[in-house]
């Protein structure tokens, strides 16, 4: 391309600045998830951005917008009753001969390393509404997951 057809600003490749993606669907939260979201918003609001470089301040403001949106759209789900797997339950299951325990939580609260999975995750969707002793299909395998136990989680 001829230099005559280039703008000086073409020399700088600027990455587009997008908002942080909001997960589709409802923003269900546990009591713990709502508390953590409020704490995150408060912590971000307490940070003085006036001393930050412009890019750092923009990133901070984008993060704050995300968490304010998540707080505004949060739907606190009631503590589940009954024996079935539901949002806000601690589930012990057996998969491939190994027993594991997870808590089914909202998207922002999910952390598989801590045993917290989102209600939109494939495993949570597969075991939803199952009761102890039931086997459910998962990963293309029939009866792959056996539900061992279910307990409501009030606030962890």
Cite the ranges covered by each PLM segment.
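Short, compositionally biased
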Residues: 148-156
């Amino acid at each position: 391309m001829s230099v005559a057809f280039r703008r000086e600003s073409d020399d700088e490749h600027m990455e587009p600045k997008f908002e942080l993606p909001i997960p589709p669907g409802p923003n269900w939260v546990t009591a713990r998830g709502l508390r953590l979201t409020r704490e995150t918003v408060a912590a971000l609001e307490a940070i003085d951005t006036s001393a930050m470089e412009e890019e750092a301040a923009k990133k901070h403001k984008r993060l704050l917008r995300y968490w304010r949106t998540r707080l505004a759209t949060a739907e606190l789900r009631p503590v589940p009753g009954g024996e079935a797997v539901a949002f806000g339950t601690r589930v012990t299951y057996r998969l491939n001969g190994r027993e594991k325990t997870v808590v089914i939580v909202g998207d922002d609260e999910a952390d598989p390393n801590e045993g917290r999975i989102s209600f939109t995750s494939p495993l949570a969707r597969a075991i939803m509404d199952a009761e102890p002793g039931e086997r459910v299909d998962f990963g293309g395998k029939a009866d792959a997951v056996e539900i061992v136990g279910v307990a409501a989680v009030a606030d962890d």
